[in-house]
């Protein structure tokens, strides 16, 4: 198979440098990526740590007006402590304080491995009403630490750099929990601040955490 060598300066990104782009068959080889395309910004793999933080301007993290929508993916999140919770909080001072006031709702579905107790329920104890503490991303006290147990899911954060509007977010997680149940949790709400959110922290309510979290920007 013949190989063709391209010089580095044969790729002209100038026409689309301010947008997402992809290769095509045109002379300059590039085209603007369609809206909704995702750009991987940062991958963090936690190993028995207290928290995972994404701070704008630190370690190549982008969390500003570059994107209107950001996506966090949770992969193989495993706690060191049994029957704990994965949580999130936000900062407006690049992580000096994680105490943004939040309004949220929370409901979940579940089914035991023995095919009992299938249910959908609103969990009032897991929502926040102008609370500044951690927001649960799974039902309280249920994240399992057995070798075969973990949590996965995602969270969207919308327009965090706005200094006009509150900051909406929504999350879905699925876990094999400490009670050997398949449990899915749905969280939605907003950070009730018109200051720009420039840092996000994920942690367990008790003990350390393991797993991988990926941050993506969604092309406007």
Residues of each region from the PLM?
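Surface-exposed molecular-recognition determinants
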Residues: 2-220
């Amino acid at each position: 198979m013949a190989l063709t060598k391209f010089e580095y300066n044969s790729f002209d990104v100038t026409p689309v440098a301010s947008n997402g782009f992809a290769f095509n068959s045109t002379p300059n080889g590039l085209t603007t990526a369609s809206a909704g395309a995702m750009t991987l910004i940062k991958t963090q793999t936690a190993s028995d740590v207290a928290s995972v933080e994404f701070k704008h301007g630190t370690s190549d993290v982008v969390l500003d007006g570059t994107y209107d929508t950001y996506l966090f993916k949770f992969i193989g999140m495993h706690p060191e402590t049994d029957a704990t919770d994965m949580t999130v909080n936000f900062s407006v001072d690049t992580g000096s304080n994680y105490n943004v006031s939040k309004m949220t709702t929370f409901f979940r579905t579940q089914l035991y491995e023995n095919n009992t107790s299938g249910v959908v329920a609103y969990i009032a104890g897991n929502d926040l009403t102008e609370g500044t503490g951690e927001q649960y991303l799974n039902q309280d006290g249920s994240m399992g630490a057995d070798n075969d147990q973990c949590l996965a899911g995602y969270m969207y954060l919308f327009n965090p750099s706005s200094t006009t509007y509150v900051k909406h977010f929504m999350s879905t997680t699925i876990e094999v929990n400490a009670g050997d149940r398949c449990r899915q949790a749905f969280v939605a709400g907003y950070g009730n601040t018109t200051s720009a959110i420039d840092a996000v922290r994920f942690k367990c309510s008790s003990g350390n955490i393991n797993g991988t979290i990926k941050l993506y920007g969604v092309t406007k």
